[in-house]
Amino acid sequence: MRERVLALLRQVASGEVPVTDALARLSLPDTESLPFATIDHHRALRQGVPEVIFAAGKTGDQVLAIARRLAASDVGVLITRVPAELCDPLRSCFQGIEVNELGRIAYLPPAEPPGAGQGEILIVTAGTSDLPVAEEAAVTAHALGNAVARLTDVGVAGIHRLLSRTDALASAAVIIVVAGMDGALPSVVGGLVPVPVIAVPTSVGYGASFGGVAALLTMLNSCASGVTVVNIDNGFGAAFAASRITHGYAARGAQGVSQITQAVHSNS
């Protein structure tokens, strides 16, 4: 795909192809059909991020085949919900692939690094049991070109742990808060910071947590204004949303997050 795009851009530069025609061509679908999948090679051109492989429900051979085709385009490969039995085959097939077994996620960096987001994405977990979802978010955010920091096991059962790290909260551009049980931590964080807070309910908890539904409802009903909520255990979705925010900051120029934060503080 990269070679075809480069050839088209050269034709535009030489005047052989009008800009409007080139734009129309680049907007057309560019897919590759396998017996079990239709790979979207133009996803990166449309959305800025290549297609991501969701491994759950797929056989190991299917995941590897899709990954090989994406890797051949030099766009990088991100695979979520990787089962334990697929970790070693991925390492054998792809030199340089990073497999995070705790987060059940694998990442093969592209030939060229992705554009950098402005500022740091901080991932806060209520408890150690929330780490698998948090690691999915961390690897995803890194793969999308972001600086990532972690703040682990600072839930409301010992709120002093969080309050002793307000420096980390204050320096973040976007904060992802991952919590199960009662799901109260995002509201606490949302009441302390002026930056976007993305809440991720997890399925961690005893019976009446209903597999994360209790945490989800708590987060949806947060009294901290502006807390955004994604689906249960969806660390990937939270990181994707956070990355769009940081890349939006970057697109607005060098004024950066610090000036935005100062403006919010001055008006509060």
Specify the residue positions occupied by each region the protein language model found:
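Glycine-rich phosphate/diphosphate-binding loop of Rossmann-like nucleotide-binding domains
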Residues: 117-160
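Short glycine/serine/threonine-rich phosphate/pyrophosphate-binding segments
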Residues: 61-63, 130-135, 159-160, 179-188, ...
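Glycine-rich oxoanion-binding loops at beta->alpha junctions
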Residues: 105-111, 147-168, 213-214, 230
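Glycine-rich phosphate-binding loop
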Residues: 164-202
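Long amphipathic alpha-helical segments
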Residues: 1-83, 88, 92-93
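Short, acidic/small-residue loops that bind anionic groups at enzyme active sites
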Residues: 98-100, 189-212, 267-268
